[in-house]
Amino acid sequence: MVSLQKLEIELQELFKQKQYSKIIFEITSQTEDEERSSSLCNLLGLSRISNDNKNKDSLSMALRDFKQGYLKEKNTNHAIDCLANFITSSVLLIDLEKNYKFDFSEIINFYALTEKFCINHRSINLAMAMVYRRLN
């Protein structure tokens, strides 16, 4: 088993260098789903959508990563970042698929569970604005 903290630091440097494919390889080859921290899940999801042109498959895989990261820690800063990216990526996928009858209840429930931790978190509030705009 690899030291997750050391891996996170190394991968953050790779992310700054925009080496997304390498990040995806390192995370998926050195860790199992259940041992990844919210931070690693977030980094993996961001790398998946930054590596491609936001196609359906990369967005779907990133959504799984973001959701997993949020559910692991719920009220940490990394989990809130995962939730913001989960919401934004969901909206991007909905727009890509032109799925205008999408059920936003899961997103709204996740947000409601963490709302008091998200009050000053700009990215999640912008993401929720995207959701509410699509509901009207």
Descriptions of predicted regions:
Residues 2-5, 9, 43-47, 85-88, ...:
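"A position-specific structural signal for the A-helix of alpha-solenoid helical repeats
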Residues 24, 44, 51, 70, ...:
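Heptad-repeat amphipathic alpha-helical coiled-coil interaction surface used
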Residues 17-22, 74, 102, 136:
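Short helix-adjacent coil turns
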Residues 22-30, 56-71, 98-117:
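Alpha-helical repeat scaffolds
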Residues 35, 74-77, 119:
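Short coil turns that delineate tetratricopeptide repeat
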Residues 4-29, 33, 49:
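Alpha-helical segment of the N-proximal tetratricopeptide repeat
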Residues 45, 50-56, 90-101, 134-136:
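Short coil/turn linking the two alpha-helices of tandem helical-hairpin repeats
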Residues 5, 39, 78-81, 123:
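Start-of-helix register in tetratricopeptide repeats
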